[in-house]
Amino acid sequence: MKAILHKANTRGHANHGWLNAYHSFSFASWYNPERVQFGVLRVLNDDTVAAGMGFGTHPHDNMEIITIPLEGDLAHKDSMGNESIIKTGDVQVMSAGTGIQHSEFNPNADLQTKLFQIWLFPKYRNVVPRYQQITLDIAKQKNNFAQILSPNEEDEGVWIYQDAWFHLADFDKDFSKTYEIKKAGNGIYVFVISGTITVNGQELETRDGFGIWDFNKLE
């Protein structure tokens, strides 16, 4: 087994007033040559957006972009004609492909929005852009690895143009579970939203990241 530990306090940080962002991988003005990507995982941003504020219209291409709200809502609008509110408990994905433009705003006047935005390099370049949003069954995450994303349109969760799988889990104290890799040769990146867990002997705390490869299962 090979592994790399990203402690929460080693992440990049930028506070723009309206946006307080922590970067697990190099992003914008924060660059760490040892923290550019983990496999196809390019961006893992932990964002807090102030009430009534947000990201103006901006472009993307050839990237799989996943948004997971943790608290509050996010209003989305894009050049494909999609307009939606992404709520806590939802997951949204955009395959940017040949190119899209979109904006994201906190629609609430008095509540902040917290979210993860995750970017993955695509398996195929210049695909037709697509959008998908679903509401998750939170109960499935209790003491279980609930799949929320995969490469398969027919599978549970949203799907993307990449051989990657996302799972969310909410474990009770002293609960133990084994995770088996989905595809030979893939690695796994574990990110702790809240609490303390032990993964293959490594203790992880809130907002720590842990990348593992050359292994068969996770305990």
Regions found by a protein language model. Name each.
Residues N15-P59, M63-E64, L115, D137-E180:
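A short glycine-rich, His/Asp/Glu-containing loop-to-beta-strand
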Residues G54-G56, D73-H76, Q92-V93, G97-F105, ...:
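Histidine-centered metal-chelating micro-motifs
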Residues D61-M80, T88-V91, D174, Y179-Q202, ...:
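Glycine- and acidic-residue-biased ligand/ion/polar-headgroup-sensing regions
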Residues E64, S84, D90, I100-H102, ...:
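Generic beta-strand structural signal
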Residues M80-S95, I138-Q141, N200-E219:
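Short acidic-glycine-tyrosine-enriched beta hairpin
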Residues G81, A96-N126, E205, D214-E219:
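Ligand-binding loop in jelly-roll beta-barrel domains
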Residues S103-F105, N126-I134, G157-Y161, Y179-I181:
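A short secondary-structure junction signal
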